[in-house]
UniProtKB/Swiss-Prot annotation:
Residues 1-44 have a biased composition (Basic and acidic residues). Cu cation binds at residues 333, 335, 362. GO terms for molecular function: copper ion binding; nutrient reservoir activity. Expressed in seed (at protein level). Expressed in seed. Keywords: Allergen, Copper, Glycoprotein, Metal-binding, Repeat, Seed storage protein, Storage protein. Homotrimer. Homohexamer. This is Vicilin Cor a 11.0101.
Length: 448
């Protein structure tokens, strides 16, 4: 269907109609030519719009795609992908410069070699089942974890893990806060050989002989055998032993203490819930593991065709990782606008693995596609004292304004303003653009 008010089409038709020397057939042919030209022009404009959308995503410093990850570990049995520093493309995200994001992927029945990190780690099990073992002060603690579990790994703590599932891959999302070089972290492998290279190999043989009280030939054998990488296949017997064996007091979760053991985010009561979605939150005020990092972890499951927001955070910058599903997000940003005092719409398509960031104060909305639920894991930095301000639905900020303030701000009678902002009776999760149109009988698609 062509636009009703295409000025070029209207001008072309008038010209054909006014040409008196044309007979009726010629006028009809001329009209058809005008419409074909209008269609071509509309298609060109559409292609230009899509190119502009693609360019917008390329220049968007708030969105990170596959190409923004690098492989730190890659073996036949799994990999570790690390997101580039948040400030690599823009200083606009300098508030989270000392945080890094990584994703571990491991095949069924695999072993991830022992390592320690010069960073504080918080892990979220996005998929699968694992056993995570930490060595602390001459004792070992093991935790069986599953989908939805959050666990803290203190900086410098030796840690290793297994994917104890025989059929399902393991996916773990990690957020790291470096403690040595701001914005940079390293994994240090003690156990290993050539791949992963053991840090013991950096010392001279004389020093190692004296420290370990063994001969060089023995050292060369121990530190020269492993060459398969830091993620390797393990037998069923090894997996069974590492899932259950424990020295000292048993600490296999859920029998361990909450202060060091996992928190299952999805077992908590949702902080927001209706037919359009659910939000689960682990707040630092409620969980000791997250307090000193000033970090909140949340998980949103947005029903297909629905949306979360718009809203904004007062202090927290939200780092979001798409775990499952598809959709898109929109955010109002004053920093990328070409003129002062105005806002640019930041938007991007969302799919599994995409990372997007909403800084404090930036209004944002996240919309699920019509085909699948959209599941988003979020790490909120600077969470202490943060407030979430809704911009639509129950409790939205405009409804809290005084009547006179509404009239002065909008230059309209307050009843007209209230007719807009009091119409939505849901909170946080709402029907998305497509559902709204379907309910209104207007049809159309906002996103595919």
């Amino acid at each position: 269907m062509l636009p009703k008010e295409d000025p070029e089409l209207k001008k072309c038709k008038h010209k054909c109609r006014d040409e008196r020397q044309f007979d009726e057939q010629q006028r009809r042919d001329g009209k058809q030519i005008c419409e074909e030209k209008a269609r071509e022009r509309q298609q060109e404009e559409g292609n230009s719009s899509e190119e502009s959308y693609g360019k917008e995503q390329e220049e968007n410093p708030y969105v990170f795609q596959d190409e923004h990850f690098e492989s730190r570990v890659k073996t036949e049995e799994g990999r570790v992908q690390v997101l580039e520093n948040f400030t690599k493309r823009s200083r606009l995200l300098s508030g989270i410069e000392n945080f890094r994001l990584a994703i571990l992927e491991a095949n069924p029945h695999t072993f991830i070699s022992p390592a320690h990190f010069d960073a504080e780690l918080v892990l979220f099990v996005a998929k699968g089942r694992a056993t995570i073992t930490m060595v602390r002060e001459e004792k070992r603690e093991s935790f069986n974890v599953e989908h939805g579990d959050i666990i803290r790994i203190p900086a410098g703590t030796p840690v290793y893990m297994i994917n104890r599932d025989e059929n399902e891959k393991l996916f773990i999302v990690k957020i790291l806060q470096p403690v040595s070089a701001p914005g940079h972290f390293e994994a240090f492998y003690g156990a290993g050989g050539e791949d992963p290279e053991s840090f013991y190999r950096a010392f001279s043989w004389e020093v190692l002989e004296a420290a370990l009280k063994v001969r060089r030939e023995q050292l060369e054998k121990v530190f020269g055998e492993q060459s398969k990488g830091s993620i390797v296949k393990a037998s069923r017997e090894k997996i069974r032993a590492l899932s259950q064996h424990e020295e000292g007091p048993p600490r296999i979760w859920p029998f361990g203490g909450e202060s060091s053991g996992p928190i299952n985010l999805l077992h908590k009561h949702p902080s927001q819930s209706n037919q359009f979605g659910r939000l689960y939150e682990a707040h630092p005020d409620d969980h000791k593991q997250l307090q000193d990092l000033d970090l909140m972890v949340s998980f949103a499951n947005i029903t297909k065709g629905s949306m979360a927001g718009p809203y904004y955070n007062s202090r927290a910058t939200k780092i979001s990782v798409v775990v499952e599903g598809e959709g898109f997000f929109e955010m109002a940003c004053p920093h990328l606008s070409s003129s002062s005092g105005s806002y640019q719409k930041i938007s991007a398509r969302l799919r599994r693995g995409v990372v997007f960031v909403a800084p404090a104060g930036h209004p944002v909305a996240v919309i699920a596609s019509q085909n699948n639920n959209l599941q988003v894991l979020c790490f909120e930095v600077n969470a202490h004292g943060n407030s979430r301000f809704p911009l639509a639905g129950k409790g939205n900020i405009v409804n809290e304004f005084e009547r006179d303030a509404k009239e002065l701000a909008f230059n309209l009678p307050s009843r007209e303003v209230e007719r807009i902002f009091k119409n939505q009776d849901q909170a946080f999760f709402f029907p998305g653009p497509n559902k709204q149109q379907e309910e209104g009988g207007r049809g159309g698609r906002a996103f595919e």
